[in-house]
Amino acid sequence: MAELEHLGGKRAESARMRRAEQLRRWRGSLTEQEPAERRGAGRQPLTRRGSPRVRFEDGAVFLAACSSGDTDEVRKLLARGADINTVNVDGLTALHQACIDENLDMVKFLVENRANVNQQDNEGWTPLHAAASCGYLNIAEYFINHGASVGIVNSEGEVPSDLAEEPAMKDLLLEQVKKQGVDLEQSRKEEEQQMLQDARQWLNSGKIEDVRQARSGATALHVAAAKGYSEVLRLLIQAGYELNVQDYDGWTPLHAAAHWGVKEACSILAEALCDMDIRNKLGQTPFDVADEGLVEHLELLQKKQNVLRSEKETRNKLIESDLNSKIQSGFFKNKEKMLYEEETPKSQEMEEENKESSSSSSEEEEGEDEASESETEKEADKKPEAFVNHSNSESKSSITEQIPAPAQNTFSASSARRFSSGLFNKPEEPKDESPSSWRLGLRKTGSHNMLSEVANSREPIRDRGSSIYRSSSSPRISALLDNKDKERENKSYISSLAPRKLNSTSDIEEKENRESAVNLVRSGSYTRQLWRDEAKGNEIPQTIAPSTYVSTYLKRTPHKSQADTTAEKTADNVSSSTPLCVITNRPLPSTANGVTATPVLSITGTDSSVEAREKRRSYLTPVRDEEAESLRKARSRQARQTRRSTQGVTLTDLQEAERTFSRSRAERQAQEQPREKPTDTEGLEGSPEKHEPSAVPATEAGEGQQPWGRSLDEEPICHRLRCPAQPDKPTTPASPSTSRPSLYTSSHLLWTNRFSVPDSESSETTTNTTTAKEMDKNENEEADLDEQSSKRLSIRERRRPKERRRGTGINFWTKDEDETDGSEEVKETWHERLSRLESGGSNPTTSDSYGDRASARARREAREARLATLTSRVEEDSNRDYKKLYESALTENQKLKTKLQEAQLELADIKSKLEKVAQQKQEKTSDRSSVLEMEKRERRALERKMSEMEEEMKVLTELKSDNQRLKDENGALIRVISKLSK
């Protein structure tokens, strides 16, 4: 007891010492030094008892009364003017609090006194949100019955049904949503849509009329950043909203986006170069208030922002330099514009002059042709040189040349000039003045080889006047190709009716069309070089200027005699006004010297055709190998020829031959003047005359000449077909050979003029007087010729397009067909005789011509014998028993079907076995997996038990230690009690 009293005295002493220390500190404080009046002025008035009186605001008193459920006090406060919708610091009203407290009586009392059932707190929660979250079904029903909205969203974009956890509450709210027809998605996006509309309006008006929130000072940019309205954020930034605007607490939009973890909003603000180091009133940066998972993203955005800021600075410097350069270059542009305006009247005058010269040259060519190539060059040289107006703002264009064409051409020079007049301005230049260096670079040529040729030929051209180089990409090539396709269609129709011979019309046309197509594809410089080499090889002087190297509508022959020129003019007038197939049926008028245009061409036909064939061979493109098709067609053709030739020579054939021979004799008597030597000289010089435009120069006189067979075949074909006249549709040549006068001559004139010595009527009888030796020799020659012809035939058939091939079906014999075939055979014999006369020399004798006729007859008989053997083979093939073949094939097919069915059955059996094996394997694997799963579960259960046991062991050790400690304390207390008891 004495010890306890001693301890109590010590405690009292220490308490007195602490109190004394407090008094000492009070005496030295500033409060103790203030006057007593000031200290008492700020205190509450004293009551009677002397204690101060505390006063609360009316709103706080009202909320406290509602919370306590004192309805009488609430009525008194409402009577004194208290606001029933007053809120506390969190925005909660009395209705919110009554709903949270589940006080249905107070809820009814407040609603009856006109409390707002849709009032939202600071987080956007309405009383219905609170009731749905707490699960108070009766309060929620009461709110709904009294007009509470089920579509209001809180700050998180949640409607009351999203907060409901109990199924009954969720069903109630969803049913009400359907009943009221509320679109929840639209409700969630309503705020964003409203902000989007306002942002667009501000962007269009250029004026931002935003109102800060009264409580926090937040702006629309803060709300868009915090809620992740990316589109609204972009529009506000585009409208010029201040990126670093701060609310009342100093928070920027980046603070809000970082705090609420909106990554996209942070990226948009950072890319817009907002300040990422700005601090709020508490000294916090966006990194300090950011969500933990967003800090790294903000650091990356800061690095990216530094790069963007540096790029923007360099871009601004470049823009300033560009503006300076544009200001400096404005002066030069204005000067060049003035120069351009001065040159415009000159270009208009030059266009008018070009049109006049084009029309005059076209009319002149329709009336007559030029006498030599020099006249063509002079007219071409009279045309002004074209240049392109150059300025800094216009792209350079290549110069094109317009050359007047004949009236038949669908693409005339005047239309070409109209086409190019809108694209080019052509100021007139002095003719003796060389163009400047920068204008020379605008010339367009076929290839770089053209430049050297232009440089070499510039001096002589400048003497005659400024020349125009035609562009290799001239639009006239397309017109030429179109006309060539039309002509090919007509010729293919003719060739289908003509007899199939080695040198038939269709074959020659096929070869020449292919050659012309290849030549058209080549560039201008290549063809120009080719013509130059061939001219040197023929040793004929060439005076063609480079200005007309692709002028396919103006080529004329440079070397002609006066008589040839007259014949050319006459034939040209006829060809320009009469269609091709009509001209073929009439002889041309004679010239002043009595020489027709027909024998002029008949001298060098065969030799030139051989030479042309040898030269053309290198220009043909490789073709596909269709050996099977060619063999089939050759076999069918031989069968048809066998059917024709085995009939023998009929009376109709003999009558036709007599009529032809008598007609030729009468014409030969009408032309009694000997023309052998003039024919030779004129044929060498004037044969390359062109009555239609051609792409081949004049130096290839004999090269493009076609064989006799072409003219001989075309004459009877045109007689039979009676080609309609087409004056409105000109025939443009596709190859050199189609532009030769051989198309305009009559076949009987051709072979009549071959014979310089008149034949006697005994030519019919001498045909049958050949010897056996000559027969054998001719048969050997015929075998060689047939072998060569078969090879060429297969090559020709491989080249022929499918649309031009004849049908190979069964032919039915008719009388008309037999007569036609007979006439064709007679014409073929005449063709062979003429070719022998032609190869025999320039002065053939009558006996040689008779021998050729006999040899031709012998060859024809040998051919008939060979074809007869082929026919017998075909008949043997036709005698096969196709019924047996069909039956054997049918039985074989049936056997194969049975084998196929057996194989299918075996395959199905094997598949079923494989499926069974796979199923067994799957079952085994599933059993194994189930066993393994059970083992894993048992292992996990044992591991859990072991862990629980270990925890229990730990608790047990702790309990043991606690028990030991309690025992020790108990012993100590016992000892103390024992001492005190003493």
From Swiss-Prot:
<feature type="compositionally biased region" description="Basic and acidic residues">
    <location>
        <begin position="850"/>
        <end position="864"/>
    </location>
</feature>
<feature type="modified residue" description="Phosphothreonine">
    <location>
        <position position="445"/>
    </location>
</feature>
<dbReference type="GO" id="GO:0031672">
    <property type="term" value="C:A band"/>
</dbReference>
<keyword id="KW-0963">Cytoplasm</keyword>
<feature type="compositionally biased region" description="Low complexity">
    <location>
        <begin position="731"/>
        <end position="742"/>
    </location>
</feature>
<feature type="compositionally biased region" description="Acidic residues">
    <location>
        <begin position="362"/>
        <end position="374"/>
    </location>
</feature>
<feature type="compositionally biased region" description="Basic and acidic residues">
    <location>
        <begin position="375"/>
        <end position="385"/>
    </location>
</feature>
<feature type="compositionally biased region" description="Polar residues">
    <location>
        <begin position="389"/>
        <end position="401"/>
    </location>
</feature>
<feature type="region of interest" description="Disordered">
    <location>
        <begin position="606"/>
        <end position="864"/>
    </location>
</feature>
<dbReference type="GO" id="GO:0017020">
    <property type="term" value="F:myosin phosphatase regulator activity"/>
</dbReference>
<feature type="repeat" description="ANK 5">
    <location>
        <begin position="249"/>
        <end position="278"/>
    </location>
</feature>
<feature type="repeat" description="ANK 4">
    <location>
        <begin position="216"/>
        <end position="245"/>
    </location>
</feature>
<feature type="region of interest" description="Disordered">
    <location>
        <begin position="342"/>
        <end position="517"/>
    </location>
</feature>
<feature type="compositionally biased region" description="Basic and acidic residues">
    <location>
        <begin position="623"/>
        <end position="632"/>
    </location>
</feature>
<feature type="modified residue" description="Phosphothreonine">
    <location>
        <position position="808"/>
    </location>
</feature>
<feature type="region of interest" description="Disordered">
    <location>
        <begin position="556"/>
        <end position="579"/>
    </location>
</feature>
<dbReference type="Pfam" id="PF15898">
    <property type="entry name" value="PRKG1_interact"/>
</dbReference>
<dbReference type="GO" id="GO:0005829">
    <property type="term" value="C:cytosol"/>
</dbReference>
<dbReference type="GO" id="GO:0008047">
    <property type="term" value="F:enzyme activator activity"/>
</dbReference>
<dbReference type="InterPro" id="IPR031775">
    <property type="entry name" value="PRKG1_interact"/>
</dbReference>
<dbReference type="InterPro" id="IPR002110">
    <property type="entry name" value="Ankyrin_rpt"/>
</dbReference>
<feature type="modified residue" description="Phosphoserine">
    <location>
        <position position="947"/>
    </location>
</feature>
<dbReference type="GO" id="GO:0048812">
    <property type="term" value="P:neuron projection morphogenesis"/>
</dbReference>
<keyword id="KW-0677">Repeat</keyword>
<feature type="modified residue" description="Phosphoserine">
    <location>
        <position position="29"/>
    </location>
</feature>
<feature type="region of interest" description="Disordered">
    <location>
        <begin position="1"/>
        <end position="50"/>
    </location>
</feature>
<keyword id="KW-0206">Cytoskeleton</keyword>
<feature type="repeat" description="ANK 3">
    <location>
        <begin position="123"/>
        <end position="152"/>
    </location>
</feature>
<dbReference type="InterPro" id="IPR051226">
    <property type="entry name" value="PP1_Regulatory_Subunit"/>
</dbReference>
<feature type="modified residue" description="Phosphoserine">
    <location>
        <position position="839"/>
    </location>
</feature>
<feature type="compositionally biased region" description="Basic and acidic residues">
    <location>
        <begin position="656"/>
        <end position="680"/>
    </location>
</feature>
<dbReference type="GO" id="GO:0007165">
    <property type="term" value="P:signal transduction"/>
</dbReference>
<keyword id="KW-0040">ANK repeat</keyword>
<feature type="compositionally biased region" description="Basic residues">
    <location>
        <begin position="633"/>
        <end position="643"/>
    </location>
</feature>
<dbReference type="GO" id="GO:0019901">
    <property type="term" value="F:protein kinase binding"/>
</dbReference>
<dbReference type="GO" id="GO:0001725">
    <property type="term" value="C:stress fiber"/>
</dbReference>
<feature type="compositionally biased region" description="Basic residues">
    <location>
        <begin position="797"/>
        <end position="807"/>
    </location>
</feature>
<dbReference type="Pfam" id="PF12796">
    <property type="entry name" value="Ank_2"/>
</dbReference>
<feature type="compositionally biased region" description="Basic and acidic residues">
    <location>
        <begin position="918"/>
        <end position="927"/>
    </location>
</feature>
<dbReference type="GO" id="GO:0005654">
    <property type="term" value="C:nucleoplasm"/>
</dbReference>
<protein>
    <recommendedName>
        <fullName>Protein phosphatase 1 regulatory subunit 12B</fullName>
    </recommendedName>
</protein>
<dbReference type="GO" id="GO:0005737">
    <property type="term" value="C:cytoplasm"/>
</dbReference>
